[in-house]
Amino acid sequence: LFAHHFQNKMIGLFLGDSDFSEIVLKKIKKLNKKYFIIDFSKNNKFKKDNNSHRISIGKFGKIINLIKEKNSNKVLFAGKIAKPKFSTLRLDLKGIYYMPDIIKASKLGDAAIIKTIIKILNIENIKVISSISFNPELAVKNGNYTKLKPNMNDNNSIKKGITYFNKLNNLDHVQAVIVKNNTILATEDRQGTKKMLSKLKKKSEGILIK
C-alpha cells in the first residue's frame, strides 16, 4: 500500500544546469512518474516542459505553496543551481525569513546553498530524496574500477583523509580533499574542485576524496 501511495505522489524536481538534470528528468518521464519542475537553471532551460515553473530562490513561500498545491511531499535536486544575485533578488515573506541563512551559506559555496535549502524544506515538512532515487544505475558499487590499486600507505592516507573530510564537513561545506603520504595536500573551497586541482603541482600524485 505504501509503495502504491508513493508511486502516485507527485515528485518535485529542483533542476539546475548540467547534463545530470536532463538525465534525471528523462528517466522520470520513462518511468511515467508524475512530476513538476522548479527550474533553477541559468537560462530557464526547462521552459518548454508544461510542468515547469520558474520561481526565484527568494520566493520561498511561492515554492513551498507550489509543492503543497501539487500534493507533493518529496523533492529532489539535480544539476548545478546558479548562485543568485542577492542584491537584485525579489523576496516574499518566507524568503525574507530564510534569506539570511542562504546568504550565509553562499559564502561557503554551492553545496552549502543546497544543504541550507534542504534544511528549510525539512522545516516545512518536505522531504528531499536522493538525486539518484530513480537513477540507481548512475551510482557505482564499492570496489576497484581502475588498473591501479591502493597500497597500504594509500589506504592509511585515505582513512586519514576521510576522517579529516568528515570533521571539516561538519563545520564547513567542503566537497573534496587531496591526500598523499598521510598528509592533506589540498581542500576544496567555494571555488570548486577544478580550482583546487589547478593549484597542485603537476606531479603531486595525490588521492582525491570527494
Per-segment meaning from a language model:
Residues 53-67, 107-111:
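Glycine-rich anion/phosphate-binding loops
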Residues 39-59:
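N-terminal beta-loop-helix "entrance" segment that forms/cooperates
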Residues 80-83, 183:
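Short glycine-rich anion-binding loops that position phosphate/pyrophosphate groups of nucleotides
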Residues 1-9:
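N-terminal amphipathic/basic-hydrophobic helices that include classical n-h-c signal peptides
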